[in-house]
Amino acid sequence: MTKKIYLALALSSTLIIDSLLQAEESPVSKYDPLAITLADIQWGPPGGGNGAPVGVQTARQGTDPVTGGITYYAKFPAGSHFDKHWHTHDEFVVVVQGTVTIVLGEESHSVSAGSYVVIPGKLNHSWDVPEGEEDAVIVVRRAGPADFHYLDR
């Protein structure tokens, strides 16, 4: 019986050590390291219209190689409005600067820097940035490829 216990301990120790060695050799992620500040962002040209706020600027940070979901910054000018729309995939948002009023379904929420918002796929939502305040900057992470479906069209 003692030989069986020693054999079991030796086998399990070997498996644990082997898995630790493999973990050290295996890449942790397919992503490259990235650390970026708001001041470092390379904004795209102002765009918008056709439902999106006029003057909105974006800066893509990456695309998930498995889901096709993108991560990007978006800067909305003060006084701008994003028409009611929905996306197929879930959307995760962190407000980095400014204040945004977001309507999720039928509920309105005023969120400011540091706020986190989850927008389930297919949920109608719209955005407003108050007039006379600073531009709003958000970071968006999508769970799948981006698509926009506007309601009032």
Labelled PLM ranges:
Residues P77-S80, H87-G105:
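Glycine- and acidic-residue-biased ligand/ion/polar-headgroup-sensing regions
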